[in-house]
């Protein structure tokens, strides 16, 4: 196969939320049989057809960088991990739908990426809330994915999905909730597949068409990030 243009997408979230299983599902359309802890960073490739079915269709490589570790790691570990955050074109934030703390920690993961070069205007305070100040000049496309949907009891599902909708709204991002043990969760033609394709198209557009030849430093089209619904969202 001829060399293809590529984009780099970080996959961030707490250990145990299912990032490795998600990446394997997205890249190979198969369930990962024996997932293990990611040490450092693991990279896999998804082949994506940009604007599939149109005259502008073109095939790209999507590099999915599964970053391991904990958001509460020592500063030395975060400093080492920051090397993976260079030249990022998109970010997938992954949380476990059965674990509220993993959802809350997505804000800290996001700040860790943004803080690699400069201090943002939004700050983390001791009670876990975030300032509603705008992050200036941040245009990296984001997607929020909740895993382990199959483990949410039907009686709790509505409550959980409302909470995740608020979470995605805070990031001004689309959300996907799925079961990584079921390949049909992201099968072609499904609503999840449509959202994924739309996200990857946006990442490619930002990288290759929005500002030709330049990396874009932040989150895409953000009005405000970090506060919003989180003011009413606390972990037990």
UniProtKB/Swiss-Prot annotation:
CDD domains: RabL3. GO terms for molecular function: GTP binding; protein homodimerization activity. SUPFAM superfamilies: P-loop containing nucleoside triphosphate hydrolases. It comes from the Eukaryota. Disruption phenotype: Embryonic lethal. Belongs to the small GTPase superfamily. Rab family. This is Rab-like protein 3.
């Amino acid at each position: 196969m001829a060399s293809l243009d590529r984009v780099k997408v970080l996959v961030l979230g707490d250990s145990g939320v299912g990032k490795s299983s998600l990446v394997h599902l997205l890249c190979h359309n198969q369930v990962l049989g024996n997932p293990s802890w990611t040490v450092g960073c693991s990279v896999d490739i998804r082949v994506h057809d940009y604007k599939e079915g149109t005259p502008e269709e073109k095939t790209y490589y999507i590099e999915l960088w599964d970053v391991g570790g904990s958001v509460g790691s020592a500063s030395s570990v975060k400093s080492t991990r920051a090397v993976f955050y260079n030249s990022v074109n998109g970010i997938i934030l992954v949380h476990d739908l059965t674990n509220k703390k993993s959802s809350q920690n997505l804000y800290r993961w996001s700040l860790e990426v943004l803080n690699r070069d400069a201090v943002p205007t939004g700050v983390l305070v001791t009670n876990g809330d975030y300032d509603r100040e705008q992050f200036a000049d941040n245009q990296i496309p984001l997607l929020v994915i909740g895993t382990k949907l199959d483990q949410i009891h039907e009686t709790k599902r509505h409550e959980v999905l409302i909470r995740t909708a608020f979470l995605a709204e805070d990031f001004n991002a689309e959300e996907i909730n799925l079961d990584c043990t079921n390949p049909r969760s992201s099968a072609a033609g499904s609503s999840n597949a449509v959202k994924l394709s739309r996200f990857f198209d946006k990442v490619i557009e930002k990288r290759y068409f929005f500002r030709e030849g330049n990396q874009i430093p932040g989150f895409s089209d953000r009005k405000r990030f970090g506060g919003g619904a989180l003011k009413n969202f606390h972990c037990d």
